């Protein structure tokens, strides 16, 4: 007798047919506390318990991408399970994949892990691909587009920024794409339908379900942003889009975040890591230099009473701290990227650098138009000594700069995704590039037994460096009053 039946409802949801007891077990298994819920207004107001429930007990529906995890759950409890035949794996061999790739006449060889990732995606018909920076993610996306692109099955490629709209178009043309690539972002036509469209998610998330019915395949780059309600809304509205893939360089350590992504896109596909790519010489060698700035007893005492926002404001306005970052950037050889989080801090650093060097100093933030950002990116790649002061939110995601030698992480962050993405900006290989150096700037304002936020976040980053097997060294620098 079957205990659990997984029945396909549409491309987004499955229905779980079972008795009430098993339903409650499954609902509990797929319920998670949302990270940071204690600081959210609804939780503070007592309107929400801080949990996200992926299984709806009103209709026993759950994201279809979680079928594999539900099957594992049932087998662990000896439940007999019946899986809808439409949810199974497709037959697609390595040999078939190689023949298909050969027919594309690509300008270079597809790496082994790229081939295997492509095959796994096709077999599953969906998937969440963990693809480190410079692992050739855009080529895998291109292969999927060409494989699924037949009459009546156009591809919608969703990226987080207008810079990536232009960059993805350039990558596809480099691979030999002859199709017209329609770009959708602010000020562009959103109703034109063609073989492939590249769009920012901000441009389309308010569109009705009917608009998404026109697409046969949806691919989301930087899919970890799906924790934002807008991308979740897009994927939930695309109820008839069977081929769906998410690509990301990393996931947060939150189980809730991971489960939502798998639910929307499918099982995780991870076939290579950053350290493996460095070892295989596909990426530049990485050196992480952790610089811990030390402050006077007077300043430690002054900062000991500050909350997080106040500490960040105190640090970013600290004259000697900003001078240290400026001098560090000016002392480095090669192209340097200085990443900031707050606009006022970035503007101050940019002004300081311009006062000392008017040549090849650039500024990039959300206010800079996408085409202008792309021009700056191209300029950097043709220079040997430039400094770009850039918003971490804009430049840590997906921007492809080959000739980048140094990165200065000027603003504290404990976000695993943000840190790994920032490091990833400098790992692409170039003929004149020996390695990439990542400068992790943190602050020791410890007073008595109280450890400040910047130092706490630094300790979490060190744990990340150890986990990722990055080569790092810690240096302490005294900032004189």
Locations of regions flagged by a protein language model:
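Conserved pre-motif I regulatory segment
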Residues: 54, 84-130
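Conserved helicase ATPase core of P-loop NTP-dependent helicases/translocases
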Residues: 166, 181-193, 347-348, 359-396
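A short beta-strand element within the Helicase C-terminal
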Residues: 215-216, 390, 399-412, 421, ...
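Conserved interdomain hinge at the start of the Helicase C-terminal
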Residues: 303-341, 347-352
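Conserved segment of the helicase C-terminal RecA-like domain
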Residues: 425-459
């Amino acid at each position: 007798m079957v205990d659990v039946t997984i029945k396909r409802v549409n491309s987004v949801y499955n229905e779980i047919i079972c008795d009430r007891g098993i339903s409650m077990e499954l609902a509990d298994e797929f319920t998670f506390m949302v990270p940071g819920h204690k600081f959210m207004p609804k939780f503070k107001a007592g309107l929400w318990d801080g949990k996200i429930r992926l299984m709806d007990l009103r209709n026993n529906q759950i994201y279809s991408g979680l079928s594999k995890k539900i099957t594992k759950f049932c087998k662990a409890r000896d439940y007999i399970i019946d899986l809808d035949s439409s949810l199974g794996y497709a037959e697609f061999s390595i040999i078939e994949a190689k023949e298909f790739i050969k027919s594309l006449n690509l300008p270079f060889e597809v790496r082994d892990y790229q081939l295997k990732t492509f095959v796994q995606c096709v077999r599953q018909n969906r998937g969440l691909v963990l693809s480190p920076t410079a692992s050739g993610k855009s080529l895998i996306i291109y292969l999927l587009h060409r494989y699924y692109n037949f009459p009546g099955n156009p591809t919608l490629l969703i990226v987080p920024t207008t810079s990536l709209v232009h960059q993805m178009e350039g990558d596809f043309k480099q691979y030999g794409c002859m199709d017209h690539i329609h770009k959708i972002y602010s000020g562009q036509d959103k109703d034109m339908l063609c073989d492939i469209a590249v769009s920012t998610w901000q441009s389309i998330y308010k569109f009705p379900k009917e608009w998404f019915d026109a697409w046969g395949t949806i691919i989301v780059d930087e899919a970890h942003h799906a924790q934002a309600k807008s991308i979740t809304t897009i994927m939930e509205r695309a109820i008839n889009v069977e081929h769906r893939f998410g690509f990301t360089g990393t996931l947060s350590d939150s189980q809730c975040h991971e489960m939502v992504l798998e639910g929307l896109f499918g099982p995780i596909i991870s076939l290579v890591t950053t350290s493996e790519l460095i070892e295989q010489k596909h990426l530049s060698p990485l050196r992480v230099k952790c610089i811990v700035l030390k402050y006077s007893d007077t300043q430690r005492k002054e900062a000991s009473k500050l909350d997080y926002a106040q500490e960040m404001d105190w640090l970013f306005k600290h004259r000697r701290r900003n001078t240290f970052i400026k001098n560090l950037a000016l002392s480095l050889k090669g192209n340097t990227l200085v990443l900031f989080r707050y606009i006022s801090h970035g503007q101050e650093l940019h002004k300081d650098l311009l006062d000392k060097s008017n040549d090849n100093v650039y500024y990039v933030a959300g206010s800079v138009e996408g085409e202008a950002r792309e021009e700056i990116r191209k300029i950097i790649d043709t220079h040997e000594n430039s400094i770009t002061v850039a918003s971490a939110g804009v430049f840590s995601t997906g921007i492809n700069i080959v000739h980048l030698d140094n990165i200065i992480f000027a603003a504290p962050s404990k976000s695993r995704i943000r840190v790994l993405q920032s490091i990833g900006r400098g790992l692409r290989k170039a003929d004149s590039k020996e390695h990439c150096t990542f400068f992790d700037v943190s602050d020791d304002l410890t007073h008595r037994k109280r450890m400040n936020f910047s130092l706490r976040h630094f300790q979490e980053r060190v744990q990340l460096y150890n986990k990722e097997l990055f080569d790092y060294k810690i240096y302490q620098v005294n900032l004189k009053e």
